[in-house]
């Protein structure tokens, strides 16, 4: 893609999300969401592959339906209450519609079916943008309409953690595994959002570098399926040694960074006297941990078949900067000692 066009699209992507962040009016927030959607569509279809075009079409139809529902719900709320302000108390019916529309935009279960299929048709870089940046604006909007319908939010959170764990079990495609991982992590954030929004934001902040690291590692290895990871030792031995730590951090295993938000969320849910919800979320994390372990095993403990006379793949020096990956990998693995300081900051 032309660098000038690419810079305009990325700028529009940032502008749309920033507009939604800064808006206190539902029409402006809707406009920001639409700018982001329209900016990412050319990035998704830039390779002109039938799968990419199919994924782009599915994404466009889903996002258009969600945007129409947001517009309808906000108009209905303005008609009932006479207010367009986001921070104004919403009527229960429009609030429920808005929650479902934002859940559809983010890919929360049970309206998640588009996300694995769309991610499967994209390259890893665009998939990374879809899994991280595109979640921010709907997430912030959901934070602002939170106090209205807690039972619907709890249902979305529990369903997402279960579906995110269950759906990834039988997958061999790495992009689908990462899609279900995204659904499960968003489920954890949504569960705690109604009780402690700072904790939900902390989970999102830690989720982003972990996902960034995982996507970048798979891109460096040119891997799209679990089976192709077997050649990782020959291509990038140092990166392959670090990868299990990042994957197990995504699974929430101590003493890695990913354990911190899960630990704090379970603590908060128990404080709020909903131990059953906390238990279901904790057990669903075991399902996710299994498929992260499977990917780690395929990458580090298996070697691709070759005879002794054959040469190993060339370890070509990458031309891209490895600094962002190094920083995100460090954050993904080593933030747990900061948990007491984080708890103190959250309780201010």
From Swiss-Prot:
Query: What's the Enzyme Commission number for this chain?
Result: 7.1.1.2
Indicate yes or no for the key word Transport.
yes
Keyword Protease found: no
* UniProt subcellular location: Mitochondrion inner membrane
Q: Which family does it belong to?
A: Belongs to the complex I subunit 2 family.
| Top-level taxon of origin | Eukaryota
* A GO molecular-function descriptor: NADH dehydrogenase (ubiquinone) activity
InterPro entries per record: Complex_I_Subunit_2, NADH_DH_su2_C, NADH_UbQ_OxRdtase_chain2, ND/Mrp_TM
Q: Which UniProt keywords apply?
A: Electron transport, Membrane, Mitochondrion, Mitochondrion inner membrane, NAD, Respiratory chain, Translocase, Transmembrane, Transmembrane helix, Transport, Ubiquinone
Q: What protein does this entry describe? A: NADH-ubiquinone oxidoreductase chain 2
Annotated membrane topology is: Multi-pass membrane protein
> What is the protein's known function?
Core subunit of the mitochondrial membrane respiratory chain NADH dehydrogenase (Complex I) that is believed to belong to the minimal assembly required for catalysis. Complex I functions in the transfer of electrons from NADH to the respiratory chain. The immediate electron acceptor for the enzyme is believed to be ubiquinone.
Biological-process GO terms, alphabetical = mitochondrial electron transport, NADH to ubiquinone
Q: Which reaction does it catalyse?
A: a ubiquinone + NADH + 5 H(+)(in) = a ubiquinol + NAD(+) + 4 H(+)(out)
List S-S links within the chain: none
A Gene Ontology cellular-component term: mitochondrial inner membrane
| Residue spans crossing the bilayer | 3-23, 24-44, 60-80, 95-115, 136-156, 177-197, 198-218, 239-259, 273-293, 325-345
């Amino acid at each position: 893609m032309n660098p000038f066009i690419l810079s305009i699209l990325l700028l529009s992507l940032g502008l749309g999300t920033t507009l939604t962040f800064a808006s206190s009016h539902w029409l402006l927030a809707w406009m920001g969401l639409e700018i982001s959607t329209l900016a990412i569509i050319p990035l998704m279809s830039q390779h002109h592959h039938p799968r990419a075009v199919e994924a782009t079409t599915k994404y466009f139809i889903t996002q258009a339906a969600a945007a129409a529902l947001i517009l309808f719900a906000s108009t209905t709320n303005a008609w009932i209450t006479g207010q367009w302000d986001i921070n104004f108390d919403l009527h229960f019916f429009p609030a429920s519609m808005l929650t479902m529309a934002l859940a559809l935009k983010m890919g929360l279960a049970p309206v998640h079916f588009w996300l694995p299929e769309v991610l499967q048709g994209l390259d890893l870089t665009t998939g990374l943008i879809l899994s991280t940046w595109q979640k921010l604006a709907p997430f912030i909007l959901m934070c602002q309409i939170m106090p209205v319908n807690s039972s619907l939010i709890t249902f979305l959170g529990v369903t997402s953690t279960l579906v995110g764990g269950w759906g990834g079990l039988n997958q061999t495609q790495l992009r689908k595994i990462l899609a279900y991982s995204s659904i499960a992590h968003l489920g954890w954030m949504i569960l705690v959002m109604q009780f402690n929004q700072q904790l939900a934001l902390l989970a999102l902040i830690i989720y982003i570098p972990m996902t960034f690291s995982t996507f970048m590692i798979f891109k460096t290895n040119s891997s799209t399926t679990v089976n192709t990871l077997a050649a990782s030792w020959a291509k990038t031995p140092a990166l392959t040694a670090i990868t299990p730590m990042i994957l197990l951090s995504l699974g929430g295993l101590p003493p890695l960074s990913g354990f911190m938000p899960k630990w704090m969320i379970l603590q908060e849910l128990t404080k709020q006297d909903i131990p059953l919800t906390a238990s279901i979320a904790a057990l669903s994390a075991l399902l996710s941990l299994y498929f992260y372990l499977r990917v780690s095993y395929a990458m580090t403990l298996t070697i691709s078949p070759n005879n002794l006379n054959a040469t190993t793949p060339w370890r070509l020096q990458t031309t891209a900067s490895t600094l962002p990956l190094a920083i995100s990998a460090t954050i993904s693995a080593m933030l747990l000692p900061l948990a007491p300081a984080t708890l103190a900051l959250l309780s201010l």
